[in-house]
């Protein structure tokens, strides 16, 4: 029997506060939807917005596109919600995001990108990670996309977006999710070995031209002995 989503308390976030803003001004996010029968160019923008939301700006590459899903969406064979579901379950998304993160971080990333809000607290992160580890990534994605929260905010035809990132009452907006939660976490960076370690090694072995060994320097005899030693095994 699968474990249901555990209870977690809510916290105050911008999207849970009543809005007194004027619709259509600069503080409102641009909505990409298929409700108004979009043209071909408008459909291109909708597809691009979906990739940008799910894959983030750092991963919008031609290699990551799913032309089969795009074709289905263009010919109204699937809804925007199903297109979002397909991107989340695609092999490229799994390789780029799921395989390089732990369950907690991956759950946080998906909540931000699918529901358009930040996680409320660590309890919510744990609750979603339990769904992920006990029921698998497909059931986890289905739970997010089929949730009541997704239905009320985006429905079948609207691309998810970061809700109320900029509000009129504040001079600065919240950090975009693609910058707040990038692809790699600090723990994976340590396992991966980032380039600065290689740079440090290169800097330590670099010899400026003015202090290079001259004829008679013992360092040259060390290099010569190494060449003689390894020449026996060639």
Curated annotation (Swiss-Prot):
GO cellular component: chloroplast thylakoid membrane; phycobilisome
Function statement: Rod-core linker protein required for attachment of phycocyanin to allophycocyanin in cores of phycobilisomes. Linker polypeptides determine the state of aggregation and the location of the disk-shaped phycobiliprotein units within the phycobilisome and modulate their spectroscopic properties in order to mediate a directed and optimal energy transfer.
Major localization class: plastid
Subcellular location: Plastid, Chloroplast thylakoid membrane
Superkingdom to which the source organism belongs: Eukaryota
Membrane topology: Peripheral membrane protein
Boundaries of every PBS-linker domain copy: 11-191
Name used for this protein in its record: Phycobilisome rod-core linker polypeptide cpcG
Gene3D superfamilies in the cross-refs: Phycobilisome linker domain
One GO term of the biological process aspect: photosynthesis
Family as reported in the entry's similarity comment: Belongs to the phycobilisome linker protein family.
Alphabetized UniProt keyword annotations: Antenna complex, Chloroplast, Membrane, Photosynthesis, Phycobilisome, Plastid, Thylakoid
